[in-house]
Amino acid sequence: MARGRNAKPSTRSKASPKTGAKARKLEPRKRGKVVLLSGGNPQIPKGDGDAPVQAYIAAMPGWKRAIGKRLDAVIVRNVPDVRKAVKWNSPFYGIEGQGWFLSFHVFTRYVKVTFFRGASLRPVPPGTSKHEDVRYFDIHEGDELDEAQMARWVKQAAALPGWVP
């Protein structure tokens, strides 16, 4: 295609290598390193099953990793047929055909456990939500995790209809 006399030459190269911010952003993933998002939340590709959840937990920074391992163990111990997945950079736990009952997410100073039908749990987890049924339980560094209470919540939550996105 011929250019007219007043046409500007293209400043775009035909085959430009990835450079700049975009290349730096992609580089860690090439090397197999996990990118930590805002608040230190691991960026794990979405996927079903235990493997992506374990990858998420392994990538949790510092003291939060131990909390992730303990939460996962409590859930598996109390709901042996639990279904696991990583969605929206968070591990999800559910029952096949019933939906998701629990998720957790890493923030800068705490790990937030989400009970999708938490308003129906007894006692009700303390963290409120703008969603009527959802309740949260935040775990901060140095907090003692009451595994017995967490197990009671997990059993109750797994018995309820779950959240289906």
Residue ranges and their predicted role:
Residues A2-P165:
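Charge-dense, helix-prone N-terminal extensions
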